[in-house]
Amino acid sequence: MSNWKNSVDPAVDYLLPIAKKAGIETAWDRYEAMQPQCGFGELGVCCRICWKGPCRIDPFGNGPQRGVCGADAHTIVARNLIRMIAAGAAAHSEHGRHIALTLLEVGEGHAPAYRIKDEQKLRKIAEKLNLAPAGKDIRQVAKEVALASLDDYSRQKRNVPCNWAKETLTAERVDKLAELGVMPHNIDAVITEIMGRTHVGCDADAVNLLLGGIKGALADYTGMCLSTELSDVIFGTPKPVITQANLGVLKEDAVNIAVHGHNPLLSEIICDVALKMNEEAKKAGAKEGINVVGICCTGNEVMMRRGIPLATNYLSQEMAIITGALDAMVVDVQCIMPALTSVAECFHTEIITTMAENKITGATHIEFREDSAVESAKKIVEVAIEAFKKRDKRKVNIPDCKQTAITGFSAEAIMAVLSKLNANDPLKPLIDNIINGNIQGIALFAGCNNPKAIHDNSFITIAKELAKNNVLMLATGCGAGAFAKNGLMTQEATEAYAGESLKAVLTALGKAAGLNGPLPLVLHMGSCVDNSRAVNVAVAIANKLGVDLDKLPLVASAPEFMSEKAVAIGTWAVTLGIPTHIGIVPQIMGSSVVVEFLTEKAKDLLGGYFIVETNPELAAAKLVAVIKERRRGLGI
């Protein structure tokens, strides 16, 4: 790997040599030590589902072509894939359940740390779910919405689809998915069904297995959608906010607390409590008090709603500790590296776990519960202040790297900006500019980071090329983090990289929104669960045009995808009719049936399909070609 550049993030480039000199192992070191990775696993042809195995299929056709039970490569690859989808759906949907249960507690008056911050949105959701909120007390509406959402985890009638899936998609798409038998009726049941059908001696038809995976991906979409919408009700719907990103947001003279993970229930309270405990931090010697920063999707949540600076994204989370300036990293669920505690041992940093089902050996555990949220947050901040007192100033190396980032573009915020140009028909300016070609299409960037690609590079490279081709870009998750850290969520990026017609549209919208300049080149829509915000925008456009989602000049890209959640997201994007690029070779190449289904046959069946391309320049060209193909289909 001598010619391999690990990252385009200057903060990472600054800190990696420091880590190496100190003998601190990072994700990049562990990835290199893992080479060569298992070829059977890379192809998806290793089966560990029963203890007759593990069984490995010879991809060259010379050795075993079936496992001990007789499962062939197609069955093995499909089973492995849809189990990943089930895990991803479980992760997102458990997040959603947590939010829904908290909303129920708010409605019942049992969660004093939380309140309803967006009553208007709550009533709109109630109307969407056919709950007739008019004239009802807001707490009653909260209870009814929460219970209707929780129904999506418990409904036993298989012919009644999940509320949040049925009411948020186009009618044509709902009908198509129902005809295919893949509309979920119950998130938990669908995940259970996947685990059951992939047990030894069950479903052995690759295509049938994949259809089960598609159903699981739609369950994931359901859980994500309700997570986002109900979080907005409790914490407020994001509006444009100017903040900063990258590790330069850490401060030498402050108690630095990073919130990391995915669940805003904890991080929001940490932010509140930190403000109230500023004086305690100053008494401990921190001249600037407490500085809360974000990492990963929890970071995106508080960045969108509060303007809390984003320190970094998934792959570089260890770098926050290696600065020597981080006093506490408070983690909840998902995408938290177990290695954090090992890195923290080299510094004074406290790694604080907070969820009963997510502990890490070597971390300090402070249990978080909604009914005692403030008390838990106070304990956490106190631990951070005590850690600050132990900080070794000789080890502090904060890179001088931070970028301005304009974030907070929820679907509602985008509509509010558009309404400045046409209050009676906010979508008209957007649709008119798509039809006349000023905006060629829309691209959603999502997903993770992966050391198999140069950190952040594919996001940046593809975005610059799409911008040149006048494609409007949205972003979520660690992809959004890449853009924020590398300066693509600024007005200057729009001036530098946008094609002339896209630049003109973004400038008109930015000035109308009072930004005294264009909107940023990439619009930050939130965390990974907030991919559903992009669906809301797409569905609104499709309904306005009278077409289904698979006709829109809309694409998605996850150029550095890594997690099982990303597998689920990509699958539901394809299922909704969105051509979806992935920049990491998926672990399915051992089955021609699975590859053909996901990259070709899905196009005929669903309208969406996967585009596998590891070269970001070629990926950008392919996405532009897809957008042009879709435009021709619409006759524009």
Curated annotation (Swiss-Prot):
Binding site for [4Fe-4S] cluster 2: C47, C50, C55, C69
Function: CODH oxidizes carbon monoxide coupled, via CooF, to the reduction of a hydrogen cation by a hydrogenase (possibly CooH).
GO biological process terms on file: generation of precursor metabolites and energy; response to hydrogen peroxide
Family of this protein: Belongs to the Ni-containing carbon monoxide dehydrogenase family.
Principal subcellular localisation of the protein: cytoplasm
Enzyme Commission number: 1.2.7.4
Key words of the record: 4Fe-4S, Cell membrane, Cytoplasm, Iron, Iron-sulfur, Membrane, Metal-binding, Nickel, Oxidoreductase
Subunit text: Homodimer.
Membrane topology: Peripheral membrane protein
Binding site for [Ni-4Fe-5S] cluster: H262, C297, C335, C448, C478, C528
Reactions accelerated catalytically: CO + 2 oxidized [2Fe-2S]-[ferredoxin] + H2O = 2 reduced [2Fe-2S]-[ferredoxin] + CO2 + 2 H(+)
Note on how the cofactor is bound: Binds 3 [4Fe-4S] clusters per homodimer. Binds 2 [Ni-4Fe-5S] clusters per homodimer.
PANTHER family xref list: CARBON MONOXIDE DEHYDROGENASE (PTHR30109:SF4), HYDROXYLAMINE REDUCTASE (PTHR30109)
Domain commentary: Cluster B is an all-cysteinyl-liganded 4Fe-4S cluster; cluster C is a mixed Ni-Fe-S cluster which is the active site of CO oxidation. Cluster D is also an all-cysteinyl-liganded 4Fe-4S cluster that bridges the two subunits of the CODH dimer.
GO MF, any single term: 4 iron, 4 sulfur cluster binding
Regulation: Inactivated by O(2).
Compartments where found: Cytoplasm; Cell membrane
Originating species: Carboxydothermus hydrogenoformans (strain ATCC BAA-161 / DSM 6008 / Z-2901)
Residues that coordinate or bind [4Fe-4S] cluster 1: C38, C46
Protein name: Carbon monoxide dehydrogenase 1
Listed GO CC annotations: cytoplasm; plasma membrane
Cofactor: [4Fe-4S] cluster; [Ni-4Fe-5S] cluster
Family matches, as InterPro entries: CO_DH_a-bundle, CODH, HCP/CODH, Prismane-like_a/b-sand, Prismane-like_sf
